[in-house]
Amino acid sequence: MKSFKVLALCAAVLCSLVSCSSGKKEYRNYFKELGYSQEEIDAKIQAAVHEVFESERRAYHEVGDDMAYVADVKNRDVRTEGQSYGMMVAVQMDKQDMFDRIWTWTKTYMEHKEGPMKGFFAWHCRYDGTHIDEGSASDGEFYFVTDLLLASRRWGNDGKINYLADAQSLLNTMFSKDGSDGVTGIINMDYKLINFCPDTVSNRWTDPSYHIPAFFEVWAESAQDGRADLYREIAANSRQFLHKACNEKTGINADQTTFDGKPITRSFGQYSFVSQFWYDSWRVPMNITLDYNWSGADKEWQSEYADKFQRTMASYGIEKFPDQFNLDGGAPRTIMGAGGYRTLRHSIGLVATTAAASMMTDNEYSKDLVRHLWSMKLEPYEDGYYDVYYDGLLYIFSLLHLSGNYRMDW
């Protein structure tokens, strides 16, 4: 018995020094809790990845021996948003070649090599890499850094790409921009919050869908650049911002807001209107889910938010709710178009993010929302509209979350 106790103690010590001290999280498999088999879950994810990255209607296209881009097919262009999302799918799915190809295309064609924007990325390009818009969108750089740090965690830095070095270089670029020549970093340093774009005009407001506090905590843990305390401060500020941006009754937020969470007025040519819940906003429920799963620093508010948001959607019918709203949950005053269509629809992208929020709450609609997502297919709508890009990527992200496969460690 004594020798057994000694062996047990040694095993416990070894465990604490090796795997048991790894700090790896356990990730909830919501689909399995609903009774779906692991084989069914894996097949569901693989079918979605096949549609977006491999099928004839795919968004992902390889170029030459070592590059690839993720196309916004409906708009026939390439965006930093899509490149960064493709990289996130790749690191989550352990597809290193795909990750490296997308990052190489991004560095080759999108990165500014000189001038005031040097080190930032043109957010909007053609399939051949020529720039449509020279400006940057802060969410692209935000995701790129996080993608690279996660890649460093998963694959190390001894391959053909030093992911940590590239992340550190981009971070140094961000914090070297001080407004000279109209270029700022992606963080408004007065509010310590992410801005809409890194320029002196767009630095004055933000987009709630850019706020993923847990990403900043990944930066704090892995960037090794001496800014860990700042990143944790931004994460905390971002959570408080979301409290203000999401309507206290409906949970709905506007696409673009002040740093106090108030909707801003958008202007397009001769038209101007107050920002509402449009396409960008679809991401917010899933972003908050990500922070809930990875960090758990604001669970009480996040659970209340998820309950409000899901109830607002379910009030229209779980299989019917539209994809754009006013903040009070009513019909939007202005319908935002996409891909040549301007109509409200029951979009799989919003269903996906709404279902992901079931991980934060357990109301009478949560399980049915996930079952409804499971029953849906990523395919063209009756009017011919099809968004394999945005709908498709949000759908994949949601499947990864709900299966316990959207992770920050492995």
Spans of features found by a protein language model:
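Internal amphipathic alpha-helical repeat/solenoid segments
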Residues: 42-85, 90-112, 117-133
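Extended ligand-binding clefts on enzyme/binding-domain cores
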Residues: 25-47, 51, 76-80, 115-120, ...
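Bacterial N-terminal signal peptides that target proteins for export
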Residues: 1-8
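C-terminal motif of bacterial Sec signal peptides marking the signal peptidase cleavage site
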Residues: 17-19
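Inward-facing hydrophobic residues that define packing positions of alpha-helical scaffold repeats
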Residues: 90, 103, 148, 164, ...
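Mobile, glycine-rich extracellular loop/lid and propeptide segments
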Residues: 77-80, 99-107, 135-150, 155, ...
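Hydrophobic, glycine-enriched assembly/anchoring segments
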Residues: 379-410
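Short glycine/serine- and small hydrophobic-enriched flexible loop segments
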Residues: 87-94, 143-154, 214-221, 286-293, ...
